Amino acid sequence: LRTKTTEMYTWSRAANGTTTHKHGIEYGLDFGEIKPLHTSLNISGAWFHIKRKNENMPLNYINSSFDYVGVLPSGGGNLRDRFNSTFRLITHIPAIKMVFTTSVQVVWYESTQTIYEDENGNSRYYLKSYEDKDYLVVDPVGYYDKQGRYTAWSPADADDADKSRIMYRTQPYLYEKDVIKPWALLSFRFTKEIGRVAELSVIANNFTNTKKWHTNPHSLAKTQLYPDMYFGAELKLKL
């Protein structure tokens, strides 16, 4: 006796489906040279706000044997805000043809937040209990069955044991804003002028080897703030 089994699989292709809206302010201040010290001070930085949203409608695929594949609405994305300054001290000693540059980058404020919005900026998710647990849920706009038929989503589908599984569920903390406390990075650059033909530079980023991690208070995920300490050299020829 032969039996026929129908399974569903998904495939994907690259597509430009993300929109990005970015605005902010860049600034720069030059305080000139402190002549007795042969040192100048520059301050630069920026504030920006970035909003990214996926305009495609992703699929909520359970597995190959499940009866339905959900089609989720567009609008998933994230927000990012950042305000930073860089203080740069440049000391030029002409007598020995050396330039010392010390940079301190300070991130005063940084935050990230996951969003799922409609075209008017309203959140698509809502709180719903499932198996005695609370989740933030996004309803599909429709679903496909194993015969390839598409059906628009109905509120009554949320009470169906199988169809309710293609609703997009996340832990309530997912959409909470994560704010990072201020932090600073110290870097150094030494440049030696070799006559009129070349300059040799030695670079040290995070040479204090500062290690600091940020823990998201909602998800408890950890992110490394400081890059690893590294040293480099650069040779510049003047032709």
Stretches with model-predicted labels:
Residues E7-G121:
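Gram-negative outer-membrane beta-barrel transporters
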Residues W108-Q171, K181, T191-L239:
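C-terminal beta-signal and adjacent terminal beta-strands/loops
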Residues D81, F188, P227:
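Short acidic-hydrophobic sequence patches enriched in Asp/Glu that either
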Residues H23, F83, A184, A198, ...:
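Exposed loop/turn and edge beta-strand positions of beta-sandwich/beta-sheet ligand-binding modules
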Residues E7-A14, F66-P73, Y168-L174, P182-A184, ...:
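Extracytoplasmic loops and strand-loop junctions of Gram-negative outer membrane beta-barrel proteins
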Residues L1-N16, G24-G28, Y144, T170, ...:
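Outer-membrane beta-barrel proteins, especially TonB-dependent receptors
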